[in-house]
Regions:
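Gly/Pro/Ser/Thr-rich low-complexity, intrinsically disordered segments predominantly at protein N-termini
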Residues: 1-176
């Protein structure tokens, strides 16, 4: 299947991702992971709007990160820098490329190997920072393309580094 064929699928109430041409149905998020995803998106949006840094996208937003075979992934929240949005222009279809920041919130039915696969795909496609939020342990793992991984606890500071200049919050804020 191609990204265009995925785009043309009728809306049947399910979310899908396309991985190397293979359609994968994504189960709906649970209450707690959904709340964490919304908290991340809200905190990001507030900062991004205040400093006019770009666009924050919701969980349904597809990013076409590979072609032939196509891969379209949808993180739980994402940020795309203003200069990239201006260069690309708006699109009603999938964003052509990776976000600058991808946020993945781990649900109870997620397998960590699949989450790690997504992290690797984001980084390989050009994502500059990935946050993986684990609601059950109230921790966040951050991943960078250079291989740097950090594990942050509730009272640690989560920051946007060079991807989101000036963004800082306590990890516990996204789990509130």
């Amino acid at each position: 299947m191609t990204a265009e064929e995925l785009w043309q699928l009728p809306d049947n109430g399910y979310r899908y991702e396309l991985v190397a041409g293979e359609l994968r149905q994504m189960p709906p998020s649970g209450f707690l992971p959904g709340t964490v995803a919304m908290n991340c998106g809200s905190l990001l949006r507030e900062h991004v709007r205040k400093y006019d840094l770009g666009v924050v996208c919701a969980a349904e937003t597809g990013f076409k990160i590979r072609q032939n075979p196509d891969t379209v992934r949808a993180p739980d929240a994402a940020f795309v820098a203003k200069e990239r949005v201006l260069a690309q222009g708006g699109t009603e279809k999938f964003w052509p490329g990776a976000p600058d920041l991808a946020v993945e919130v781990v649900s109870p039915n997620d397998h960590f190997d699949e989450v790690f696969e997504k992290v690797q795909e984001w980084l390989a496609a050009g994502t500059r920072l990935v946050w993986v939020a684990l609601p059950r342990t109230k921790t966040v793992m951050t991943y960078r393309p250079n291989g740097l991984v950090k594990i942050l606890q509730e009272n640690d500071e989560l920051n946007g580094a060079d991807v989101l200049p000036g963004f800082v919050c306590r990890v516990k804020e996204i789990f509130a």
